[in-house]
Amino acid sequence: MSLDQANPNRVVLRTLPAILACFRAHPKALRELRATREAAKALQEVAAWMGAQGLPATVVGSKEVRELAEADAPAAAVTARPVLGLAKLSDFAEWREAGDTVVIADGFDDPSDLASVVRAMAAFGSRRLLLAGSSERLAFEPELWDGARGALEAVRLIRAPALGGLLKLIEPTSVVIGFSPKLGRSLAEAAPIRAPGRGNVVLLSPQGVDADLQPKVEHLIRLPAGKGDHALTAGDSAALILHWLSASGPAKPKEGTGFLARKRARKA
C-alpha cells in the first residue's frame, strides 16, 4: 500500500511525461514511485533522487504498479499537492501588472477536457487557472494530471466558488471575455481586444457562459462550430482562444502618451 494515503491532496501520476515534469518542476512533491522494468530506465534520475531523500522508489511488476495507480500504467508516482487557495481581488492586480491572461474554467465535468485547457494555457504562457462550479472537484483527479502531460506543473490551480460576486468585483480592472458555442460574435470576425490598464480574464465553460453570468461578461464570443457530430469541446477551443488573444497585439497607448503626442509636447 502507498505510504501517503492520508494526504487529502494526494495525486497519483500514471504517465512518464507527468512524472518527469513533476520531478523537474516540483521534486519535493514526490512521495513514492513504482515503475515496471520497461519504464524504470526513463525514471532512473527520479528514482536516484528519491532514494537519496529516503523515499521509496522501486522497480516492480505491473500488478504492483496497478495496485498503486488503480489503473494499468507503466509507472505510478504518489505526489502531495498544496491546498488550493481562494482567488482574491488583490491577485488580479498582481496578475494584471505581470501581463498574465487569467482563465476561469466553470462547470467542467470531464477531466480530459479540462486537461486540454491546461495544455493550451501552458503552451501560451497563461499560468492562472481558476476553478468554478464542478471544475473544482477535478483538481486532484489523476485523469486530469495525466491528460495534462506535465503542463499542470506550470499552471497554478485556484478556487473561485462565488464566481458571480468575483466577476463583479474585478469589473473595473479586468476585461471578462466569455465564450459560447452558440451566442456572441464569431471568433473569426471578432476584433482584437485591447484594453490599456486592464487585464484579460477568459471565462470558459463546456455549456457556454451561464445566463446569470452573461451580464458580467464584457465580450461574448462565439466559438467555431464543428461539423456533424464532431463539435469542438471547450478544451479543444482553448488553444484557439489563447492564440487569438496572443495575436491581438500590444495594447494601444493611453490618450496623450503615444509617439505623436510626445512629439507635440516637445515642440510646445
PLM region descriptions:
Residues 1-14, 76:
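Acidic/glycine-enriched edge-of-secondary-structure segments
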Residues 4, 13, 17-20, 24-28, ...:
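RNA substrate-binding interface of SAM-dependent RNA methyltransferases
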Residues 8-20, 81-90:
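Short N-terminal or domain-adjacent regulatory/targeting segments
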Residues 20, 78, 123, 140-150, ...:
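Structured adenosyl-cofactor binding patch, chiefly the S-adenosyl-L-methionine
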Residues 43-51, 68-74:
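N-terminal beta-loop-helix "entrance" segment that forms/cooperates
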Residues 58, 63-98, 141-212:
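S-adenosyl-L-methionine/SAH cofactor-binding core of RNA-modifying enzymes
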Residues 60-61, 106, 132-133, 161, ...:
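Short beta->alpha connector loops at strand-helix junctions that form conserved
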